[in-house]
Amino acid sequence: MAREPRCRRVEYMPRVECFKPAGIPLSRLEEVQIKVEELEAIRLKDYLRLEQEDCARRMQVSRPTFQRILVEARAKIAYALSSGRAIRIEGGNYCMGAGYCRRRQREIREGEPCDFKGIAIRTESDATDN
């Protein structure tokens, strides 16, 4: 069973949550969802032109994890643009800088890592094992 992904540090929240082709109502378009941390990866690497290692450090993930996030984001954007779909930015596993952890629903101090690992749920087999 895969572990719950850790929060990715995000420094920027987009003011716009949806992009779509001009002239077509959103209700008639299929959407591609871009996670907030995927947009952050695109912003850091492609817009700010930082090195991947610096991007990974800012998002508090390993370089290979950053690479996977970036590749996934680029693929989604390419698919949406080439097939005329809307792009919706929402969701994901992220914390806002030294501010708020969306998943833990609490404030995070400067330099404090977000180590959210999900909520442990006891099953009946756990109770009988004790």
From Swiss-Prot:
Highest rank taxon of the organism? Bacteria
Which Pfam family name is an example for this entry?
A: DUF134
Give coiled-coil spans as residue ranges. Answer: none
Q: Which InterPro entries match?
A: UPF0251
Query: By its UniProt entry, which HAMAP family does this protein fall under?
Result: UPF0251
- Record's family? Belongs to the UPF0251 family.
Q: What is this protein called?
A: UPF0251 protein Swol_2090
